[in-house]
Amino acid sequence: MWAVLIMVVMVALGGWYGWPAEQRREAVVRQQADDDAGTMAVYREAVMAYFKANNVTDTSVSLAGLKGAGVLPAWSKLATSPTVAWTNYRDGAGQIYIFPAAAGARPIVAELLALSRNSLNVGVYRAADHTLFSPVDGTRIALPTLGDAVIPDGAPVWLAQAPCD
């Protein structure tokens, strides 16, 4: 009987002490997702500024190209990073696509929607039907073939248009 009581108390204490650690882990994951979304927003703004100054289509711009053009803010992690988690493509119609450079990116669509104020230009790419699924209202935007750029299935995508002068 005493063994059962001691075991119950030990399990309860283990759960009690483990609960804050799980909350801290979840807070760290949320913060990392917020950071990734913020970095993607800065990257998107830099790409838009680059294509405003360089009116080229059916291409993408590298991180080195963005740095060389001086469109990355000096305070941004992107300005000092040798690599970036994001890439881009501008199609012939001038539409800009911002998406992860590789598969396996963290799920950050909720954070992107918060940053974009629930814009329909933010969504999840569905490779099966080549659409951008918007979780805001369930719409699907058909995406064209992006030259040699490949958007990973299930990746967050943020559309943009280079501003006109």
Please identify what each model-predicted range represents:
Residues 33-58:
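N-terminal alpha-helical signal peptides/signal-anchor transmembrane segments
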Residues 1-23:
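N-terminal single-pass transmembrane signal-anchor helix
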Residues 19-37:
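Amphipathic alpha-helical segments typified by the pilin-like N-terminal helix
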Residues 7-15, 30-35, 76-79:
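Short, functional N-terminal and low-complexity linear motifs
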Residues 4, 18-21, 77, 88, ...:
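Intrinsic disorder/low-complexity segments enriched in polar/charged and small flexible residues
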Residues 100-165:
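Short, surface-exposed interaction loops/tails
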